[in-house]
Amino acid sequence: MKPSVILYKALPDDLLQRLQEHFTVHQVANLSPQTVEQNAAIFAEAEGLLGSNENVDAALLEKMPKLRATSTISVGYDNFDVDALTARKILLMHTPTVLTETVADTLMALVLSTARRVVEVAERVKAGEWTASIGPDWYGTDVHHKTLGIVGMGRIGMALAQRAHFGFNMPILYNARRHHKEAEERFNARYCDLDTLLQESDFVCLILPLTDETHHLFGAEQFAKMKPSAIFINAGRGPVVDENALIAALQKGEIHAAGLDVFEQEPLSVDSPLLSMANVVAVPHIGSATHETRYGMAACAVDNLIDALQGKVEKNCVNPHVAD
């Protein structure tokens, strides 16, 4: 008899078929208490869980006594109670490598669109404001040869540094938990403390996961240390930034502009002051949102769940010691 798994995110037909070759698959719309209650028998028997954008906490795990592995279609897993999963010896699988290049593309797009005011001036053209040769009020700022500060030199940080160094001749500063020898050798990146990075960078790109240590890592104190001409980019996790402090820094002119793919609350409220600022490029968490990459992430998540329930946890596992 095939193990039972719950799928709470739609999959392409071929990936669903692959999953069904190994498991009895039960599809649900979400993991809300109402859904769990209505499908209590299914949740009670499930050995696997696959999906994204839902909280998996101790209360849910209490309803799933046979759960052995959960697989998320994402690299981030701050919506999972890792301690609760680990205490119950439940494996947590994620997709850390599939989206690296695409997210780095998004970061570079935010750098370019904020510096060159692409969104702002495009809207002005559509509004009929381009009636003569443009003047300084339409100008942006150069990207090439400007200093890029990367906070978080992981896979995505490395991919961004590659684009910036080779494509735009940008000097690279970085701050991370440890020195990154490859970044220093390949891109001539310079490790520095966070204060130095903030003070010297023309672009500050934040690429950090959300943890207890990183929550509101960026606040009023950090923005005050940046150049008035600096541009802030966040494509990591929204709550790493105190959004009210960011809004205040933009309003006071402490920083020049911001390119944001993530926010403290998502979707972003239509009343957010960020949406009325011409110097803010706000996009709806599109970091990995291409057809190719989202398919690759889903395929990886399916393979991860198959591997996990077969006892193979050599890669993509957040808590591999559970299998020991």
Swiss-Prot record:
Keyword Calcium on entry = no
From what superkingdom does this record's organism come?
A: Bacteria
In Swiss-Prot or TrEMBL terms, this protein is called Glyoxylate/hydroxypyruvate reductase B
**NCBIfam families linked:** PRK15409.1
| Compartments where found | Cytoplasm
| GO molecular function terms attached to this record | glyoxylate reductase (NADPH) activity; hydroxypyruvate reductase (NADH) activity; hydroxypyruvate reductase (NADPH) activity; NAD binding
Provide the E.C. number(s) assigned to this enzyme.
1.1.1.79, 1.1.1.81
Q: What is said about its interaction partners and assembly?
A: Homodimer.
